[in-house]
């Protein structure tokens, strides 16, 4: 076990850094086998190392790339390339010996006329030299390339040799396939026949990928151990660790390797944050299109997954996991399961919508509203400028409301609640199948938490705190006599000098209190801004309705409600899209000032803040229409006003459900079309164009020729960096809310979500394969905090749909009328029952219509939708008993619906096991086989040991003869008695 302050404690070999003058490499007799850095200048440079996927020798694969900016000399394209390796104390600037990394066109000419560098560039160079020297000590092999087609950018290629891969795989407890293979239990009887038929039917939509084919055999996996290498299939060491695993191992080393010149920073994240390196990423396997492109996993993913032409096919999830890692594989697997589950929901939603269309002409309430013979005169919708109007003018709205406000929507709400529970259970079972296939059954998140290193910002804050503390201690020591100092304390501090700074000093809640307070105030302020914008849109609707009512055109006045609703929803949509981007940036800033210690903690806090703000932003306008519009209007003669000027708007005679449907559909479709698709396509293309134009300006005149010959790492550098899965999950979670929360008002929501997701899967796939740098593979066994958010939305959906059916729709008032007030057991007279009467002489001063004869006759009594006493009653305009009866029925429905659906959802959760039975059996079988494997290994060892001991014992025993008979066995194999002699008797 070797301990080095510049590298984490790991078993490793002692290594030395060879100093090589590339200009005179042969003079010192350097051999490739003598050191970590192998000279590759003897290789034909025209081979171009398979376009940057390998070192210059064409054998060692590039596992990772570090990118940095440098200033080129004015007269020459090449730069001196050095890596410092010094035994001086950490932080010292003295260079013991300088040596170059192997690379193209390296030179060590002292008189090369290198331009003077400023302090910051010089400091970054020294940090890079020390860090790369420490990487060499960790066992990695490096090769530098500054003679690139990108102006002012240098690349460090990193290769992990076999011994480093084995060491790190053991440290990371990576499960690797062993030689032992076993049969996967197959279904029998009827199930086997059904599965075979389904496989034949679905064969055209299966991706042509080897990893996607049904497997009958599986290799037993076990955490890699160098002591048990004989258990693993090491016949081909080059392919034993695939590119994903190799890059993960190198990234772990990069995170742990220290750089003391980076102010005690730990790992590549700190160096990236400080600008020492511009980027760090693993390479893609090669090109994905074009002629004469070598076949690779990236090309296969593009052809079978990332093209819009294969939208009808299943996703090759196993290949996605193999190339991008488990975390990204789980995201696409979850998205695929969610999209698949939307199919039955869409079918049922279409049936519900068609039922509304089929029964539209049979709906008695809408027929009564459209019947002009009823001659129902309604009260004005606004003060002064609005006049009386006929209820029959709202016929189209009433008929359209029946499409979404019918008994089938209640059934659909119950169905969608059970659908959400079934979807969650189905995903858990799918997740367990993937865990089994991907050898994650024994993987625990705690194992990753142990290796989760502090973030660069956290280390910087800890350093700042420690420096302040040290300065305060110095001030105190000035006033304390030297002889009174505690020598034991000094010894302890000296002993702790090798301990990481983040272990000695930690940030407490007191250090973070200002950030917590800022978070609280900012989030409250952002929510208040959202409410204020919704209020502004409400005022717009009211004022616009009043302005349109003054229009002389009859067509404009007849379509006031539709015009105002549509324009207001479009304004809401634009504001929501803009605020989504703003809130995303604010949530990230608020999370940064909290300074979470690890990336996992940072991600969880960011998700919570972003989801809270975006949830409020997306759903506040919908909540207003669903639960508040028309509830606090007042009555004619006693209306409620905003700012004493704007009268609260009312719902249409058919209710607010139709308006809620319009609001929900426009916002949902608009967000999906603009934010999720156009932004995802347009913004990366725009960034790519900007990078191309910058490169064209900075590059020499032969730019077009240079582009043709770019290395793989140069091409990948121009791709967009991977920013995490949070935006991808967030848009799908918000969509899931639209599908479940208000599905009672919009049965077609699952259909539009399905159509969007079919495009979304291929859009995200194409982005990952063609537009983004290859992300570092991250192990994960579930989707993390997103699962809890989904469950929370599913529970909230039951409550919200109960209130939508009960309070927003007319379902409960119709039931109450049918069973309590109807004289003939039909809905005839329901519309008249829901309307109250108002005497126009009771209008407040200045609120009566300016043109009371607009309908051609004088109006004495007008009607309005409410349950109140008539003007001829003793308690005129007071709330009637009918109101309380309907309210009691509504509350009772909410309680019954909520508890019944919750019980049914929990029952579904209980009935469906989380782990499929066959997977449970296979996991148990793996454990038994693993125990048998080790038992057999121990038996073989014991037998081998006994055989060896027997041979050793036989070597030590003297041969049997007439002179020594004590050790000679008899015919039965037992030693002869001591008194017996051969050839004689006593």
From Swiss-Prot:
Further remark: The term 'anoctamin' was coined because these channels are anion selective and are predicted to have eight (OCT) transmembrane segments. There is some dissatisfaction in the field with the Ano nomenclature because it is not certain that all the members of this family are anion channels or have the 8-transmembrane topology.
Comment field on protein domains: The region spanning the fifth and sixth transmembrane domains probably forms the pore-forming region.
Disulfide bond among keywords: yes
Glycosylation sites (chain numbering): 832
Residues that bear Phosphoserine: 107, 196
Function: Calcium-activated chloride channel (CaCC). Plays a role in transepithelial anion transport and smooth muscle contraction. Required for the normal functioning of the interstitial cells of Cajal (ICCs) which generate electrical pacemaker activity in gastrointestinal smooth muscles. Acts as a major contributor to basal and stimulated chloride conductance in airway epithelial cells and plays an important role in tracheal cartilage development. Required for CFTR activation by enhancing endoplasmic reticulum Ca(2+) store release and is also required for CFTR membrane expression.
Annotated protein name in UniProt: Anoctamin-1
UniProt family annotation: Belongs to the anoctamin family.
Subunit and partners: Homodimer. Interacts with CFTR. Interacts with TRPV4.
Induction profile: By IL13. By IL4, likely as a result of IL4-induced cell proliferation. By wounding in airway epithelial cells with levels decreasing significantly during the healing process.
